[in-house]
A protein has these predicted regions:
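Conserved AMP-binding/adenylation subdomain of ANL enzymes
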Residues: 33-50, 57-144, 178
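Conserved pre-ATP/AMP-binding loop-to-beta segment of ANL
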Residues: 1-14, 21, 44-50
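Conserved ATP-binding loop and adjacent catalytic segment of the adenylate-forming AMP-binding
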Residues: 78-80, 153, 157-159, 166-226, ...
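Conserved AMP-binding A3 loop
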Residues: 10-34
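AMP-binding/adenylate-forming catalytic core of the ANL superfamily
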Residues: 232, 237-238, 261-354
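Conserved ATP-binding/catalytic segment of the ANL
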Residues: 15, 215, 222-282
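Conserved S/T- and glycine-rich ATP-binding loop of Class I adenylate-forming
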Residues: 9, 15-18, 51, 101, ...
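Gly/Ser/Thr-rich phosphate-binding loop
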Residues: 99-102, 112-200, 304
Length: 354
């Protein structure tokens, strides 16, 4: 039998990491084992269970959650052969009825906005999003509609890879939809924080996973955002043939500096605020995290993607409209421009004055 060698290099996964330059992340077998073991600890899958693989295998999130996780248990893996549009994904869920679903936030957000909320009366949809306590029958109907869209046979949807829209998350939380948020990075193969959906706190990404330690580099982690630093079995060996970059991200005490800013409550739940290098500092001294504003924009009518930046000390949003959806509803180019201006005005009313 082959001797176990936990520190042996298993995978080199290339990533832009925290500096923008492509680097080869050297993941040892212990990292892959620890990540896969955590998946089974949180949500065991059985031989014959169905899993739809729609994340890119070149991304460690897809490699672990959409392949190694199910493969190690003898699950049946189904690979999408086309780009995962909401329509194609919904069709695959209906046919395959997966037991576990792993995806990026945008997929869930698009399906919720296009395929679930339209099934509810607009007034009810708005009520669910804004009122903390709603009628149990309304919540049950909304939850059932959402479950059916995703195949109706899953235990939990695992969302990761990008910030999750706050409004969509509030909707899912209110109807009792089984989702969880996973936070991580390639350098940890990938998971750093996560929790079961029953215990996940809204807006957080859960707690440190098994065999990992997480700290917030801040004088007051509960109220002042600081950099997320971590260490444990999931950590990489370093960057391939790049010791200088390795020493810049892993300090002498073995802590990996993620470059992400977050707070942590007294129970250990981590809430990511944004990237330290993305933080915008205004002339008035206000710290603004563009991801939080972009998340709101991306949930507004006919918005596909957004980018918030600072120009001459003014916040500016670059918007790429959802032209397919807009044209399908009969909107002209002029109508789309007017809608974007309406979105801007509405969002400004929700944001702090600074």
């Amino acid at each position: 039998y082959r001797k176990e060698m936990p520190e042996e290099l298993a995978v080199i996964n290339y990533t832009s990491g925290t500096t923008g330059y492509s680097k080869g992340v050297m993941l040892p077998y212990r990292s892959l084992w620890s990540n896969i073991a955590y998946c089974h600890e949180m949500l065991p899958v059985k031989p014959g269970d169905h899993i739809v693989s729609m994340l890119p295998m070149g991304h460690v999130f897809g490699m672990v959650y959409d392949f190694l996780y199910g493969f190690s248990a003898g699950a049946h893996l189904y690979f999408l052969t086309r780009m995962p549009s909401p329509k194609i994904i919904a069709q695959s869920f209906a046919e395959i009825k997966p037991r576990v679903i792993s995806c990026v936030p945008l997929i869930v957000e698009k399906i919720i906005k296009k395929d679930i909320l339209p099934k509810l009366d607009n007034k009810i949809g708005k009520l669910l999003l804004k009122v903390p306590i709603v009628n149990d029958k309304i919540k049950a109907a909304a939850r059932q509609a959402a479950m059916e869209i995703f195949g109706g046979n899953f235990d939990e949807i695992i969302i990761g890879g990008a910030p999750f829209n706050a409004e969509v998350e509030a909707f899912l939380k209110q109807i009792g939809f089984p989702y969880t948020i996973a936070y991580g990075m390639t350098e940890c193969g990938p998971i750093i924080c996560s929790s079961r959906w029953e215990t996940l706190k809204q807006a957080s990404c859960g707690k440190a996973t098994s065999r990992m330690e997480v700290k917030i580099d801040s004088p007051d982690p509960k109220s002042i955002a600081g950099e997320i630093i971590c260490k444990g079995m999931n950590l990489m060996l370093g960057y391939y043939k790049n010791p200088e970059a390795t020493s810049q991200i892993i300090d002498v005490n073995g802590w990996l500096h993620t470059g992400d800013l977050a707070t942590m409550d007294s129970e250990g739940y981590v809430t990511v605020r944004g990237r330290s290098k993305n933080m915008l500092l205004t002339s008035s001294g206000q710290n603004i995290y563009p991801e939080e504003i972009e998340s709101k924009f991306n949930n507004m009518p006919y918005v596909s993607e957004s980018l918030v930046l600072l120009q001459k000390d003014k916040l500016v949003a670059l918007i790429y409209p959802d032209f397919d959806d807009a044209f399908a509803h009969g909107l002209s180019q002029t109508d789309i421009e007017r809608m974007m201006e309406t979105n801007r005005i509405e969002l400004n009313q929700q944001l702090p004055s600074y």
